[in-house]
Amino acid sequence: THEPGAAATLRFAGLPTHDKRVELWLPHNEATLLVALRSDAALEPVGDDGRRVWLHHGSSISQGSNAASPSTIWPALAAARAGVSLLNLGFGGSALFDPFVARAIRDTRADLISLKLGINLVNADLMRQRAFAPAVHGFLDTIRDGHPDTPLLVVSPIHCEIHERTPGPGAFDLEALASGKVLFRATGEPGERAAGKLTLEFIREA
């Protein structure tokens, strides 16, 4: 459910008087509306600071669903360590080869592109084995239209025990919820692989 919070004011006092770059990391698991930005000195948008741009697209694992803060999501940590500017297109439950996402990546400046795909296709039970490879190639072809020479890394899904050999959809484990734990279970059956349902093992081997 959506529960709007009260308006709040954040104040940053005691900053040095010289020109400085200020980055505000907004919550990664909430929608934030900026009502006003006030300052006692001139504000200017940051231009090109010379850093390379890393564009990453993935699932909630990339969005940081379980991270403690937006700057401690794994892509943010990796970008900080590499000294690059991160554009994180991690969409919880929605890394699904949507054409508009491919077009957005195609039309966005990037020096490196990485795609971490697979888990949402299985836990959403979105498509069958026959559609998987063409969907991947269509997604990549669209991106390549705008980035013919940009390094592009496709990362297979990390281990997820419930979906390694068992198709989705995934669902909450109600017994675990009753005990205060958030766990998931696969509602598909291993035998459904023969009917074309996806598993993580199939995606890695395709």
Q: Where in the sequence are the language-model features?
A:
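Short amphipathic alpha-helical surface micro-motifs
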Residues: 5-7, 36-39, 96, 135-136, ...
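Short linear motifs at secondary-structure transitions and domain/linker junctions
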Residues: 2, 28-33, 88-91, 128-132, ...
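Serine-esterase "nucleophile elbow" of acetyl-processing enzymes
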Residues: 15, 22-92, 99-109
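Positions that flank functional sites
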Residues: 93-94, 120
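N-terminal secretory targeting modules
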Residues: 1-53, 145, 165, 172-184
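Alpha-helical cap/lid subdomain in secreted, periplasmic
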Residues: 99-206
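Generic structural hydrophobic/aromatic packing signal, biased to beta-strands
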Residues: 1, 12, 22-24, 78, ...
